[in-house]
Curated annotation (Swiss-Prot):
Prenyltransferase that catalyzes the transfer of the geranylgeranyl moiety of geranylgeranyl diphosphate (GGPP) to the C3 hydroxyl of sn-glycerol-1-phosphate (G1P). This reaction is the first ether-bond-formation step in the biosynthesis of archaeal membrane lipids. Its main location: cytoplasm. Pfam families: PcrB. It is found in: Cytoplasm. This is Geranylgeranylglyceryl phosphate synthase. Keywords: Cytoplasm, Lipid biosynthesis, Lipid metabolism, Magnesium, Metal-binding, Phospholipid biosynthesis, Phospholipid metabolism, Transferase. The lineage of its organism: Archaea, Thermoproteota, Thermoprotei, Desulfurococcales, Desulfurococcaceae. Homohexamer. The keyword Cytoplasm applies. GO terms for cellular component: cytoplasm.
Length: 254
């Protein structure tokens, strides 16, 4: 089966031209299909635009597939957010085909992509080139990927990684503080990344995405005002579903 070519990406870019986007992340290692279906339904009601499915540790094909199928019932597009080439499902709409820009491990820079490319082709998944940049806390993603997280107080380093990611073909530039991070990616890092990416002429072609550590409407609003196109939250949907709609609204209305 041929790989789907940018159909979902083009829809997301078109939707971004009308307003900011929010994605809800579900980790199959922590969430079974039953709960995943409930989280996805709540996310749709709260105004989320897509569901990301993936995790950094010990996720199997079967776990991923079950969660993807459950999340699809929400009516939202489901995008794989793989921690490795085993995080796959033919029922997903697309996969973030990501490179960890600040990893010291060749596996996460290119080897996982080589292993994952034929699988994406076989499953007919749309591959969305994604430059993944781990900032500050980093969480499990930073540890597993052997990343050198960008220090919170060095926004210019985040911006250089974002610019390089765009120049290397990334269509999603993802600044990640890590699941359960004590604080989000600094707005200064988002603003600096936005400025460089736009100056290089990639502004309308990429989605500057931020995730990790966002728990309040105020934090979401600050990231929006700094220039983020997409906000990703995961822990919030699992632990504080009542706050999700407020965070989504704050991000989209800023």
């Amino acid at each position: 089966m041929a790989v789907k070519r940018r159909r979902l990406l083009e829809k997301l870019l078109e939707r971004r031209s009308r307003g900011r986007l929010h994605f809800t992340l579900i980790d199959p290692d922590k969430t079974g299909p039953g709960e995943a279906g409930e989280i996805a339904a709540r996310a749709a009601e709260a105004g989320s635009d897509a569901i990301l499915v993936g995790g950094s540790i010990g996720v199997t094909f079967e776990e991923t597939d079950g969660v993807v199928k459950a999340a699809k019932r929400s009516g939202l597009p489901v995008i794989l957010f793989p921690g490795g080439h085993t995080n796959a499902s033919r029922h997903a709409d697309a996969v973030l085909f990501l490179t960890v820009m600040n990893s010291d491990n060749p596996y996460y820079i290119v080897q996982a992509q080589i292993l994952g490319a034929p699988l994406a082709l076989k499953l007919g998944l749309e591959a969305i080139p994604t430059s993944y940049i781990i900032v500050g806390y980093g969480g499990a993603a930073g540890f597993v990927a052997r990343a050198r997280p960008i220090p919170y107080e060095k926004p210019e380093l985040a911006a250089l990684h974002a610019l390089a990611g765009a120049m290397m073909g990334g269509r999603i530039i993802y600044l990640e503080a890590g699941s359960g991070a004590p604080k989000p990616v600094p707005p200064e890092a988002v603003a600096a990344s936005r400025k460089l990416v736009d100056a290089a002429g990639y502004g309308g072609e990429v989605l500057l995405t931020v995730g990790g550590g966002v728990r309040t409407p105020e934090a979401a609003r600050m990231l929006a005002e700094a220039g983020a196109d997409v906000l990703v939250t995961g822990t919030l949907a699992e632990e504080s579903p009542g706050k999700l709609a407020d965070v989504v609204e704050a991000f989209k209305s800023a």
